[in-house]
Amino acid sequence: VSVQTRDLAIEADAPIRTWFGVGGRADRLAHPSDVDELSTCIQMEPNLRILGDGANLLVDDAGVEELVVALDRPALKRIRIDPDSGRALAMTGASLQRLVSLCARAGLGGLEGLVGIPATLGGAVVMNAGGAFGQIADRLVCVDGLDRDGRRVQIQRDRIDFGYRRSGLGDLIVTAAEFHLEPGDPGVLRERLKTTMAYKKRSQPMAERSCGCVFRNPTLDRTIDDIGRADRRVSAGLLIDRAGCKGLSIGGVCVSDRHANFFVTSPGARAGDVLALIDAVRGRVFGAFGVELETEVVVWRRR
């Protein structure tokens, strides 16, 4: 396929910035300026990798050979809010935190439970970001995206099979999403944001280098005393804590003392340390409870 690349910025041997602050480099890193250039990237390399905020991502020390696309240009980070209709539209590279804050300031409620989740809009939709206070699918109207041929598509909320930390969007690359929100008092909404954020700061190591939750919360296949009942989803952090893993460290990475499902990196840490700690924690939890933990963090490896 002949693809016009004249105006597309592509770096060679470029760093991949993640919240962990570890890992290898991208052989090629593209910075599309808009959706059309993002479509060009897909036509160049359908199996490319999308880099949003780098929060829920671990890149192996060897880096990746596929084209990595960074959603860091202004046109891909725009947010439009219409208080009269109660609608908000955000582009794929928009900060989830900025979206939540702007909606509250405009007197539109419904997304406050997402405060404190580090993500761009696209990644948040694909992972159905959320927690105890709600998930992003709750207020979604529709998703705009590009298929792996670079063609534009729009999918309504009722056609998307959302679940726990998944969207069912498959290979679709999200370019924007629209939300329907409820009118509310801006002062009350901002106070709700402060309360939720204060709780997260008390219970999570938000000031340290971490990707957020490393593991998904598992559903138990049997009742475990003091943990949970069969067929119920339980906290992976609780299992890790009860397995005696808080403070466990390998190399420059340790299990947080504040929240056991968070791994914290220190200067000099490597992605290999994180991967080794993931294996060690999974082994301890399985040995203690017979529960197989699945990773929530996305791992990029060279093929």
Q: Where do the language-model regions lie?
A:
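Anion-binding (especially nucleotide phosphate/pyrophosphate-binding) glycine-rich loop
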Residues: 2-129
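A short, compositionally biased
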Residues: 74-75, 137-141
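Core subunits and conserved enzymes of cellular information-processing
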Residues: 90, 99, 104, 126-133, ...
